[in-house]
Amino acid sequence: MSKKLENIRNIGICAHIDAGKTTTTERILYYTGKSHKIGEVHEGGATMDWMEQEQERGITITSAATTCRWQDKQINIIDTPGHVDFTIEVERSLRVLDGAVAVFDGVAGVEPQSETVWRQADKYNVPRMCFVNKMDRMGADFYRCVDMIKDRLGAKPLVIQLPIGIEENFKGVVDLVKMQAVVWKDESLGAEYSYQEIPDDMKAKAEEYRANLLDMVVELDDKIMEKYLSGEEVTEEEIKKLIRKGTISAAFYPVLCGSAFKNKGVQPLLDAVVDYLPSPIDIATVKGVEVSTGEEKDFPISVSEPFSALAFKIMNDPFVGSLTFIRVYSGKITSGTTVINTVKNKREKIGRMLLMHANNREDVKEASAGDIVALAGLKDTTTGDTLSDEDKKVILERMEFPEPVIELAVEPKSKVDQEKMGLALSRLAAEDPSFRTSTDQETGQTVIKGMGELHLEIIIDRMRREFKVEANIGAPQVAYRETITKACEIDYTHKKQSGGAGQFARVKIIFEPLKDVKDLKEEDKNKSFIFESKIVGGAVPKEYIPGVEKGLNNIRETGVIAGYPMIDFKATLIDGAFHDVDSSVLAFEIAAKAAFREGMPKGNPKLLEPIMKVEVITPDEYMGDVIGDLNSRRGQVQGMEPRGNAQVIKAYVPLAEMFGYVNTLRSLSQGRAQYSMVFNHYDQVPTQVADTIKAKK
């Protein structure tokens, strides 16, 4: 494996469903010599889409990680899913990438899911460039897409290519850095292309865009700016250097175009990945906590530092068993060595180490900073854990995982299925942190929870195919939550005397809504529950305090209104008392649970429901009906905008009202309208609706 860090690119390819992400990745693998035959998504043969459900549905569910080479550089590509139910996969990949290519559909432009993925990439400060795909399709409009990148994403596009010809006459691109045309030969599957003079009818436009490009890049370097302003020629080398600098600092985002399906534009895209996206060295450091001191700091990304790596994905491979994908941030690791999982504080022995190509694998003996490899047979490591050198323990930044918004009951069909189902669900939950399972206390049913109907459908499908479990499925239910709306204080004493050792614990706790908490720490802003101890003078000994937190964490899973998990509140332990003999961690855990049960009703608790951001694209003539229907679903229409000859309606609608919406929309618009939705936030349920929900529980 190439050991020079500057020769590695860890990139993700992310976009909206159907923008042509997997096809683009397929072409990259083909031209870099990793696959001998181009896999077509709509034939169900794409190399990256290797789970059966993916090949059938033509969508990518799990980000396959694969390695290829271009211009002596090692490119590790993570292909991410574009369907909104799988945003967790995207979030995980972005965390371990150094750069990304955002693929846009040249016809549809910036779609809702593209926005979601873009915001996620902003969160992790991932430098990226844009590839406007499908330039050969009817209605493709490169310039409109560039405007949408500006308007919808609030990003600064740097156009470095222009399309030559439109729709079926799309022939190639104008390279604004070299100021030449790149034209592909159709008969060579796009493997052959040549640089030519820019066509006459494009010269004026190319000059105009070249001037814009120079205006934007010279701002990054005073010397080159002086040279440019005094009328001297800026060299190709200098332009490339500045584009790289601006891309890495996110001053702008280079925009390229092509048609991956028609094999045009992929090689210049690869050149741009190598020229402009960062290597691990450009990122320089990774945030983490030093275990010995508890101090948060930036650790250098370097081969000479002690070993550290982040596990970002777990996959079950039919031949190797469980595979844990890791991104190595520092140092190196060889098979046979032992490292420590610092989150679980457990040792892990490194057995087989594999370099993955979609679902083929190559054994390697060592991996070092910058590499992405899969480890076989780790016992205790789950997604988001850190593996580190035993002598210098670090915990790298954890990933935030969203709360599931939809749930269904599953019942195994037979006794044999029942035994297999437990194993299947625990394996699937280990792979996917946005998928949870629980047992309903009252009915004893197994409940599975996820990010959307498609997400759960695929989980059930995998249970059937991979684990041979047959199950009956209930109707989807909304994952409601509860919260409090005002602060309350509770002083509770737990006492139990019954022969032998007694139990004693007193706790005084303030519960308050998170929105009322002043000076929230940065790392607490995305949490749904915060616990803090303000005990002074040992009123509750240090070793008992984790018992209080554990008790609250367990009990908040069943709230006080209708038994839904309680979120968005802070619990502060302010006082308490203990007994030398009768107190224990367990006694404090019980006291905390009872304090919760007694205190929460005083906090004016309310029921919350998931609100989805819905976007409907409909022809003008159905607009009134669509809006009327959204209003009848307790929707709040936020606005409309024309897109081509259709209207885009944006609204916030409770998830509870969106089940079966696809059929209603189809009949309202004679099948011509389409919609997409993403979870946006939790909001209070109106009183009369809340009463109905409580009555059902």
Curated annotation (Swiss-Prot):
Q: Where is this chain's protein located in or outside the cell?
A: Cytoplasm
Q: Gene3D superfamilies from the xrefs?
A: 3.30.230.10, 3.30.70.240, Elongation Factor G (Translational Gtpase), domain 3, P-loop containing nucleotide triphosphate hydrolases, Translation factors
Tell me the superkingdom of the source. Bacteria
Q: Which biological process terms from the Gene Ontology are attached to this UniProt entry?
A: ribosome disassembly
Q: What is its main location?
A: cytoplasm
Q: Has keyword Cytoplasm?
A: yes
Keywords of this entry: Cytoplasm, Elongation factor, GTP-binding, Nucleotide-binding, Protein biosynthesis
Q: What is this protein called?
A: Elongation factor G
> What is this organism's lineage?
Bacteria, Pseudomonadati, Pseudomonadota, Alphaproteobacteria, Rickettsiales
